[in-house]
């Protein structure tokens, strides 16, 4: 929260130091190169690597398939000479959103059974600075880009935000609940 002192923040970070270091190693956090949405590019889905394959065929509408570690995008032949980066980006964003709908619903249900709490409402969207948020109106928002990480990571973020329904802070009681 905005009123938290620097010392309080430092205490929490220090108390979670081992966990933070373990997670940094686990996820190998490093600056990521911006996606170019090109054939052969690697994307993460639920913690697994998938490679983008772009094809052009005699069809009317674009198609996206995800299977066997591949994201296959088939575009109409008439698009072959154009820059399709924006369309491919939109298709991949929609793919992540659709995955998020299923995965977040599952994580919400699992967490509801575990802690007996559920939000009034939840949303899925891109958030620039957080994996999830919980508003004072008890609305949880989950970042659709979280779908790049494992189900355990998704379940943790959902649990974290649901615990904010009871404790709208990062107090000791909040962390005990998490």
Cite the ranges covered by each PLM segment:
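Walker B catalytic acidic pair
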Residues: 161
């Amino acid at each position: 929260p905005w009123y938290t002192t620097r010392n309080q923040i430092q205490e929490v970070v220090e108390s979670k130091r081992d966990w933070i270091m373990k997670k940094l190693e686990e996820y190998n956090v490093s600056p990521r190169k911006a996606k170019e949405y090109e054939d052969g590019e690697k994307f993460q889905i639920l913690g697994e690597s998938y490679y983008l394959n772009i094809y052009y065929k005699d069809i009317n509408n674009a198609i996206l398939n995800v299977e066997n570690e591949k994201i296959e995008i088939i575009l109409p032949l008439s698009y072959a000479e154009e820059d399709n980066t924006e369309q491919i980006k939109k298709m991949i964003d929609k793919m992540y959103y659709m995955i998020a709908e299923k995965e977040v619903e599952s994580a919400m249900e699992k967490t509801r059974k575990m802690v007996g709490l559920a939000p009034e409402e939840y949303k899925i969207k891109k958030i620039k600075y957080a994996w999830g948020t919980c508003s004072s109106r008890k609305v949880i928002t989950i970042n659709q880009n979280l779908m790049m990480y494992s189900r355990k990571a998704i379940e943790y973020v959902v649990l974290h935000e649901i615990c904010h329904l009871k404790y709208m802070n990062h107090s000791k009681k909040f962390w005990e609940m998490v």
